[in-house]
Amino acid sequence: MTFTKSVDQTTILQGDRSKLKDLLRLRLNACGWSDQVRLLCREAIKEQDSINCDALVQQVTPKARALIPDTVKKELLQKIKTILVQQEGIDI
């Protein structure tokens, strides 16, 4: 089993996955990331009038991921580590 699958299963079983997603959404909105991604989408649509949704996502995703602040990434990773440590403590 890969580390990613283990994290997914643990967070789903504990009900923490939705909490993590909510935290991520909150932090990304607070730092203006959502607005930046919205602007990237608008620019891509202006450049290519007939772009479909899949192509838009494919074009914008790498840029959007690069715009995520390191502080948000670090906070989320710390929360995941905390959840995994707590889970390990419960299993012992």
Swiss-Prot record:
Residues annotated as transmembrane: none
UniProt-listed Gene3D superfamilies: 1.10.246.140
Superkingdom per UniProt: Eukaryota
Record keywords: Activator, Chromatin regulator, mRNA transport, Nucleus, Protein transport, Transcription, Transcription regulation, Translocation, Transport
This protein's GO CC annotations: DUBm complex; nuclear pore; nucleoplasm; SAGA complex; transcription export complex 2
A Pfam family recorded for this sequence: EnY2
Entry GO MF terms: transcription coactivator activity
Compartments where located: Nucleus, Nucleoplasm
Disulfide bonds: none
GO biological process: chromatin organization; mRNA export from nucleus; protein transport; transcription elongation by RNA polymerase II
Subunit and partners: Component of the nuclear pore complex (NPC)-associated TREX-2 complex (transcription and export complex 2). Component of the SAGA transcription coactivator-HAT complex. Within the SAGA complex, participates in a subcomplex of SAGA called the DUB module (deubiquitination module).
Protein family according to the UniProt entry: Belongs to the ENY2 family.
Chain's role: Involved in mRNA export coupled transcription activation by association with both the TREX-2 and the SAGA complexes. The transcription regulatory histone acetylation (HAT) complex SAGA is a multiprotein complex that activates transcription by remodeling chromatin and mediating histone acetylation and deubiquitination. Within the SAGA complex, participates in a subcomplex that specifically deubiquitinates histones. The SAGA complex is recruited to specific gene promoters by activators, where it is required for transcription.
Protein's recorded name: Enhancer of yellow 2 transcription factor
Organism, scientific name: Aedes aegypti
